[in-house]
Amino acid sequence: MKKRKEFDSIGVVNVPADKYWGASTERSNKFFNIGKVIVNPSIIRSIAIIKRSAAIVHKKERLIAGKISNAIVKASNEVISGKLENSFPLKVWQTGSGTQTNMNVNEVISNRAIEILKGKKGTKKPVHPNDHVNKSQSTNDVFPTAMHISVATETINKLLPNLKLLEILLKKKSIEFKKIVKIGRTHLQDATPLTLGQEFSGYYEQLKKSIERIQFSLKDILFLAQGGTAVGTGLNTKKNFDKKITREISKYCKIPFRPAPNKFSEIAAHDAIVNFSGSLNSCAVALMKISNDIRFLGSGPRAGYGELILPENEPGSSIMPGKVNPTQCEAVTMVCVKVIGNHTGISIAGTHGHFELNVFKPLIAHNILQSIDLLGDSVKNFSLYCVKGIKPNKLKIKEHLDNSLMLVTALAPRIGYDNAAKIAKKALANNTKLKYEAIKTGLISEKEYDKIVNPIKMTGPY
C-alpha cells in the first residue's frame, strides 16, 4: 500500500496515500483498535455542520481568507452528503472526549479542502486542520454540540414521525373496536368487561404521553455548548462567536438551536441527554407493554387467548408446518430491552463528569443514537406490518366473555359482595353458568339478572 508522510505534535506518521485522514486518525486506528463499532455517521455529519458553520462565521469576520472558508464549506458539504464516508474509520472506544473523531473530521476536511484548492494532501497548506478547520473550537465543545445536533435531527426527522404513525394507528383501532365487548384481565385472571376499543385507547394514551415526554425533554437538547471551547470559558473565540455559529447551525439544520447560557455544565455534564434518554426509556417501557399485550391476545390460534388476529407476514417455524408467529411484537420488545439497557449505560456514563469535562462522550453518543435509530425503525415496522392489520376474533372474544365468572361483579351492588362471591365459586365448582347459579339462590330473578348483567353496560359507570 502506497503511503504518504503526515505529521502532528508528536512526530511523523505514515498514512495510506489514498486516504483523506491524517496523523491523528492514523494513530487512533492503531491505539484504539477496539471492537467493530465505528462512530455513528450522524456524529460525523454533525461535526461537519459545525465546521462549515464556523468557516462561514470566520469568513464574515474576516478571520479566514474567503477562498479557504469556501473550500472548508465545500469539503464539509461533501462529508455531510456522505461522499467521503470511507474516510471515517474510528471506533467508538477511544478517548472519552471524542478528540480523535474531531481530529478525524478536521483532517479529512483540511485535506479535501487542500485538494479543492489544487494543493497537496498532507502538507496542511493552505488549509490547516487546527488553525483553520478547528479555529475557535475545541473537541470539548464540538463533540457535545455534535451530540445535541445528532439527537435533535434524528429525533425530529425519524423517531417522532414514526411514533406519530403508531399513535395514529392505535387511535384508529380504538375507534374501530369501540363496540366490541370483551373480558378484561387483571393479574392474568378474568376481570370485568371492557371494549376492545377501550383497551386500545389505553395503548394510544400511553404512546401519546410517551411522545409528549420525548418532545418536552428535547427542549434541553436544543441548547448547544459551541463557543465554550476547552472548559467553557470561550477561550480563543471572539465575543458573540457562540451566538453567531449557533445561528448558522440552526439555519442549516432548520432547527431552532440556541447557545447554552452556561457552557461549563454542557461540557462537564450531559444531564440533558441523560434526561432525554429517560424519555426514550419510558417510551420503551410503554412499547414493551403494548406489544406484549398484542402478542398475548393474538396467541393461539386454538390453544391461546386468540382474541386478536395478527397479520401473517412469514412462516414461523422450520419444523412445524403452518405455524405463524408474532414476529413484529418480538422484534420491538427486543429493541425495548436494548433501549432500556442503553439508558442504564448513559446514566452511568453521565456520572463521569470529572471537574470540567465528562469523559464518556463517545459512549453516550453511541447509546443515545442507537436507541433513537432502533426505536424509530422498529416502531415503523410494528405499525405497518402488525398494528395496521390487526383484526378482532369476535367469536373467541364472545366465548371468553360468556364464560367469565367476573360478570358477577355487576350483581354485587344488588345482592352484596359475599353472595356474589358464593355464586361465582359455585359456578366454577359445578362447571355451570353464572346465570343458573344466581337464579338458583332466589336472591334475584331471571329478568333482573338479564337487566343487570349486561356486558355492554358494564363498560362504564351505571
PLM regions and their residue ranges:
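Conserved, well-structured ligand/cofactor-binding cores
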Residues: 1-462
